[in-house]
């Protein structure tokens, strides 16, 4: 979408009427992806384009953009740029009445709703960057499945910008499957969902490394919609991905770099595992870890009698609790980061969880545990969620 220039320094003589709730929701959506602090003030604006077809609202910070279209009665078409978060705050608190927005003779943006009246500064439209367009290959994914898969995977991405490739979620399309993968070196989360590439479907793989923060907002925004269209476009330093559902579109600049080949870390199969009730295990972990010092691992001992959690902290504080578990194989004692385990248990989305103990050719190296969903004690879950967690060394 281009950025038309205003007719003069005071801006275009725009005037339109719009439903309060529809407008408030649209503004809230487009400003959600903007950073709280932006070094370029112009990027704090929301671009509103009023035409005979209605309103188009957009926000862009050179890395991510959000766009939506809504119905409105437009008396005088034109384009305005106004501070986004301030407009969102105002719109969410307006009385239950239609909104009128117009540009006054001094170039200010006047918003009227019932007896409430606001005059906001007009930002220079001509200085706003062009919103990126995406016209590459695309496919469809079920909205609910995609939102769930993001919630199951994105939390495992790193929050440390020192290694940018680990702050993203790798989207990989192969045939009729879309995989989402994230890792911070200490854990790996993976989920697969159906992908409909339409007539352009191919067995060749397509990969895109999307910032986890942006993808998380996409999941929240599109969690209750229908199918989501995902399109890949661009090349070199301007590779982007677009997510569209209904009248909303989000684009994101992709992270440059090679995502580590973590899929090969998942074991082909092993019978050494334990099945535990997910909620019971999570509650016990929360209780016992209360006495742990920060970053200390929680000790887990798996036997045929159940799984026992032991913790000790400062000032001689200790805690222990046992939960029923169905163990196949030898007894196991290991240390796990309780927060990382709890995040996995939240992501599993099943009544029971299967904890598989992998093995390594290196006897001196701790092998990760594999966490998957389990419908019952003896029946695996239906989804394709997998989570690898690296154990911690335990002090004797």
Describe each PLM feature range.
Residues 1-396:
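Structural preference for solvent-exposed beta-strand-turn elements
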């Amino acid at each position: 979408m281009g950025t038309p220039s205003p007719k003069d320094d005071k801006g275009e003589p725009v005037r339109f009427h719009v439903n309060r709730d529809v407008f408030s929701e649209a503004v809230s959506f487009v400003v959600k992806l903007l950073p709280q602090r932006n070094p370029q003030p112009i990027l704090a604006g929301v671009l509103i384009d009023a035409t005979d077809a209605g309103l188009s609202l957009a926000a862009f910070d050179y890395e991510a953009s959000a766009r939506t279209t809504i119905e409105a009665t437009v008396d005088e078409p034109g384009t305005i740029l106004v501070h986004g978060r301030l407009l969102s705050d105002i719109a969410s608190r307006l009385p239950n009445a239609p909104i009128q927005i117009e540009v006054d003779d001094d170039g200010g943006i006047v918003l009227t709703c019932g007896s409430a009246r606001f005059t906001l500064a007009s930002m220079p439209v001509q200085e706003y960057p062009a919103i990126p367009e995406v016209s590459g290959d695309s496919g469809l994914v079920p909205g609910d499945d995609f939102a769930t898969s993001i919630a199951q995977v994105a939390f495992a991405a790193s929050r440390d910008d020192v290694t940018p490739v680990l702050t993203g979620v790798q989207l990989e399309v192969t045939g009729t499957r879309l995989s989402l993968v994230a890792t911070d070196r200490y854990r790996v989360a993976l989920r697969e969902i159906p992908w409909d590439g339409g007539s352009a479907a191919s067995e060749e793989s397509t990969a895109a490394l999307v910032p986890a923060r942006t993808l998380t907002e996409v999941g929240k925004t599109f969690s209750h919609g229908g199918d989501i269209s995902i399109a890949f476009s661009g090349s070199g330093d301007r590779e982007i991905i677009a997510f569209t559902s209904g009248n909303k579109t989000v684009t994101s600049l992709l992270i440059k770099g090679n995502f580590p080949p973590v899929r090969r870390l998942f074991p082909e199969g092993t019978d050494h595992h334990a099945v535990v009730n997910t909620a019971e295990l999570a509650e016990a972990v929360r209780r016992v870890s209360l006495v742990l010092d920060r970053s200390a691992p929680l000790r887990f001992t798996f036997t045929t009698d159940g799984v026992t959690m032991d913790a000790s902290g400062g000032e001689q504080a200790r805690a222990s609790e046992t939960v029923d578990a169905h163990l196949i194989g030898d007894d196991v004692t290991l240390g796990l980061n309780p927060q990382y385990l709890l995040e996995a248990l939240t992501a599993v989305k099943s009544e029971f969880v299967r904890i598989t103990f992998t093995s390594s050719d290196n006897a001196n190296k701790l092998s990760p545990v594999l966490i998957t969903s389990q419908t019952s004690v003896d029946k695996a879950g239906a989804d394709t969620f997998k989570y690898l967690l690296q154990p911690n060394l335990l002090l004797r």
